[in-house]
Amino acid sequence: MSNNIIKAIESEQLKQDLPEFCPGDTVQVQVRVKEGTRERLQAFEGVVIAKRNRGLNSSFTVRKISHGEGVERVFQTHSPTLESILVKRRGDVRRAKLYYLRERRGKAARIKEKI
């Protein structure tokens, strides 16, 4: 009984307007950031290295190189602070989790584009 109530409440919270993306894709994520009284959008662009599908608890990890340092950020897929996700390019990979990219540098970390 209580399980059905939880599912009903969670289904109301799910976002419906999310694009289809996979690990290996380059995405630009717009996040609402609150600084004091102001609120602005912050863009984070990088490669999706992991995706976790758990209904309302779904998340994905995006990795980018900023000033020579690798930066990874985990986003909750259905979070209200997540404004939009824009898929810039599709990557052709054969793994679900691309954690091996953490050790790769330069051209070795490139991902082929899906045609």
Swiss-Prot record:
Supply the SUPFAM superfamilies for this chain.
Translation proteins SH3-like domain
Q: Which UniProt keywords apply?
A: Ribonucleoprotein, Ribosomal protein
Q: Name one Pfam family in it.
A: Ribosomal_L19
One GO cellular component term, please give it. cytosolic large ribosomal subunit
InterPro entries reported for this sequence: Ribosomal_bL19 (IPR001857), Ribosomal_bL19_CS (IPR018257), Ribosomal_bL19_sf (IPR038657), Translation_prot_SH3-like_sf (IPR008991)
- Keyword Ribosomal protein on this protein? yes
An example GO biological process term is: translation
Give the function comment from the record.
Answer: This protein is located at the 30S-50S ribosomal subunit interface and may play a role in the structure and function of the aminoacyl-tRNA binding site.
Q: What is the official name of this protein in its record?
A: Large ribosomal subunit protein bL19
Species, as recorded: Nitrosococcus oceani (strain ATCC 19707 / BCRC 17464 / JCM 30415 / NCIMB 11848 / C-107)
Its organism's taxonomic lineage begins at: Bacteria, Pseudomonadati, Pseudomonadota, Gammaproteobacteria, Chromatiales
Q: State the encoding gene.
A: rplS
